[in-house]
């Protein structure tokens, strides 16, 4: 017996014929065709002819249009987007109608492709087999077109080229979305926040930010997502699949976005530039989020506490503060994190990976933020300026601390002696005077430090390493701050000026010591005799009297002294 073809069970009407049908006849037609589609879907029909497959899809789409009574009667055919049969035009899809029903669980779908995907969720049941398998990564596909599209992710082929800017794309849909960025057309507007989007699918995904809907759930860990692409990427964290490889170094990634971000380390390409400050980005979405820094726009508000955010990922991470969720767990030490970037940086503590390398001096960093900050030591860039005095800084935190000099704010108070400090670093350094303890200890001499960076700088006093060299005179230094201060001896810059007498200083320590001459403050007190000093160096010299330390030796006769003034006085005896 011959197999039944699609054309044997389908029925078509011309536009004129359809107009002559009574409402009851139209309803009967719709019921029959719906039943036909259900039957074809349930037997798992495989389409040998791609034209028939396309016809099946078009018929399915247009059947949904006929499920309502709104037909294109009395309208020009050119106004209609889809054709049900060669001569019959119809209106848009009727909302809420889902003619494709799963025979296993009864769930219904708008599209046959959606039903196909769903059927695979039932173990051991496939609506269509997947005859097209990728040789690169092993992924299989039901349709040849889908397989051919996937292959481009490996070959790098981008057949869709924008005539406006020359940008190329692997897939047609992102290409269409990109074209709309040139014409500025964004016909789909969110009723909640007014945001306009270029396509209806983007609007549907965006609306889930407001509703909180996350229809895509991971079967492995139960985590839910608002869009299908996110769950596909997430599932790779369980399977270990990394289909996107860097052509430069071979490193593999779970998402296309990740490999593009990584490629910056090789080529530095950032095509999207901010008109306000000139900062460049890899993706237009990153630029849009950045632009909100200038506009002050924060469209995402937390329903729990009312805090607003510039981007959707920030609010998602913030909400975990309320829920306590920490989905990223380190396999090495068990520590959990609420945000993926923090988790990735933490993992590098175990692996020792430092992917961001400075081209100037070769120093490597585990975080891109540390790398960018370090680059400023070479360029001399100081983008953060104090509006009060005009002083500029490399880092935003330094500016924040500096501002306290103007406001007088000292938020860090010592519980031992009630002394207050403008910065956490100064406070921690002070606490050592009480406890004598620090978390980072030098293996050579036992000296303790609050910060690992301070320990590294100190260790150079033992190794003799001086990686920072002055280009003017060739003098080398163990610490980046030392070379910055040293450069002022060449430029003549004296940024620390006394408001009392106008005297200016190169070094902040000299300036602070000078200011105590005006205030009378003497913070360094000798425990032996109670004598107080305004300068730490003076205090150190004084303590040598009590412990009989005499580190300064005369090269002529070998006599030792505790003070440099005493040594100088002694030297005059030899010079007579």
Curated annotation (Swiss-Prot):
A zinc finger (C2H2-type) spans 100-122, 132-154, 160-182, 188-210, 216-238, 244-266, 272-294, 300-322, 328-350, 356-378, 384-406, 412-434, 440-462, 468-490, 496-518, 524-546, 552-574. One of its GO terms (biological process) is regulation of transcription by RNA polymerase II. It comes from the Eukaryota. The keyword Nucleus applies. Gene3D superfamilies: 6.10.140.140, Classic Zinc Finger. One of its GO terms (cellular component) is nucleus. The keyword Nucleus applies. May be involved in transcriptional regulation. Belongs to the krueppel C2H2-type zinc-finger protein family. It comes from Pongo abelii. Keywords: DNA-binding, Metal-binding, Nucleus, Repeat, Transcription, Transcription regulation, Zinc, Zinc-finger. PROSITE patterns: KRAB, ZINC_FINGER_C2H2_1, ZINC_FINGER_C2H2_2. This is Zinc finger protein 791. The gene is ZNF791. Residues 4-90 form the KRAB domain. It is found in: Nucleus. GO terms for molecular function: DNA-binding transcription factor activity; RNA polymerase II cis-regulatory region sequence-specific DNA binding; zinc ion binding. InterPro entries: Ikaros_C2H2-ZF, KRAB, KRAB_dom_sf, Znf_C2H2_sf, Znf_C2H2_type. It holds the Pfam family KRAB.
């Amino acid at each position: 017996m011959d197999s039944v073809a699609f054309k044997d069970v389908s029925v078509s009407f011309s536009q004129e014929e359809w107009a002559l049908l009574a409402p009851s006849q139209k309803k009967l037609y719709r019921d029959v065709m719906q039943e036909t589609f259900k039957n074809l879907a349930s037997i798992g029909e495989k389409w040998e002819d791609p034209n028939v497959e396309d016809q099946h899809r078009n018929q399915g789409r247009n059947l949904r249009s006929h499920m309502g009574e709104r037909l294109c009667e009395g309208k020009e055919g050119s106004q209609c987007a889809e054709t049900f049969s060669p001569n019959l035009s119809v209106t848009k899809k009727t909302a809420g109608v889902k003619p494709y029903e799963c025979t296993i669980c009864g769930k219904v779908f708008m599209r046959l492709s959606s039903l196909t995907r769903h059927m695979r969720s039932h173990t051991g049941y496939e609506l269509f087999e997947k005859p097209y398998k990728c040789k690169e990564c092993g992924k299989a596909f039901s349709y040849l077109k889908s397989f051919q599209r996937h292959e481009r992710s490996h070959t790098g082929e981008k057949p869709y080229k924008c005539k406006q800017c020359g940008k190329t794309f692997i897939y047609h849909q992102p290409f269409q979305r990109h074209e709309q960025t040139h014409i500025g057309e964004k016909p789909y507007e969110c009723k909640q926040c007014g945001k306009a989007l270029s396509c209806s699918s983007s609007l549907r995904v965006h609306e889930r930010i407001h509703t909180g809907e996350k229809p895509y759930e991971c079967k492995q860990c139960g985590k839910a997502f608002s869009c299908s692409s996110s769950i596909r990427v997430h599932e790779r964290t369980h399977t270990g699949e990394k289909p996107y490889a860097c052509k430069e170094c071979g490193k593999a990634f779970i998402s296309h976005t990740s490999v593009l971000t990584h490629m910056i380390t090789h080529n530095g390409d950032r095509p999207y530039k901010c008109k306000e400050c000139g900062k460049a980005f890899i993706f237009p979405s990153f630029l849009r989020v950045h632009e909100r820094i200038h506009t002050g726009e924060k469209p995402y508000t937390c329903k729990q506490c009312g805090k607003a955010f510039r981007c959707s990922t920030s609010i998602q991470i913030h909400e975990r503060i309320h829920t306590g969720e920490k989905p990223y767990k380190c396999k090495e030490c068990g520590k959990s994190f609420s945000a993926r970037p923090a988790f990735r940086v933490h993992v590098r503590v175990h692996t020792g990976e430092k992917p961001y390398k400075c081209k100037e001096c070769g120093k490597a960093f585990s975080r891109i933020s540390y790398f960018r900050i370090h680059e400023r030591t070479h360029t001399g860039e100081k983008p953060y300026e104090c509006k009060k005095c005009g002083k500029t800084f490399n880092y935003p935190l330094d500016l924040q601390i500096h501002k306290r000099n103007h406001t007088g704010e000292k938020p860090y108070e010592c519980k031992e002696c009630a002394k207050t400090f403008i910065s956490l670093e100064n406070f921690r350094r002070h606490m050592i005077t009480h406890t004598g303890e620090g978390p980072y200890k030098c293996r050579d001499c036992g000296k303790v430090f609050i910060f690992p960076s301070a320990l590294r700088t100190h260790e150079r006093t033992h190794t003799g390493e001086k990686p920072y060299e002055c280009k003017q005179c060739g003098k080398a230094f163990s610490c980046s701050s030392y070379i910055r201060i040293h450069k002022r001896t060449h430029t003549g810059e004296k940024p620390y000026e006394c408001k009392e007498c106008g005297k200016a200083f190169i070094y902040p320590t000299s300036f602070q010591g000078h200011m105590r001459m005006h205030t009378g403050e003497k913070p360094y007190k000798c425990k032996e005799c109670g004598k107080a000093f305004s300068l730490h160096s003076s205090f150190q010299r004084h303590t040598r009297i009590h412990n009989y330390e005499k580190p300064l030796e005369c090269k002529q006769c070998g006599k030792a002294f505790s003070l440099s003034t005493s040594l100088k006085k002694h030297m005059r005896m030899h010079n007579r």
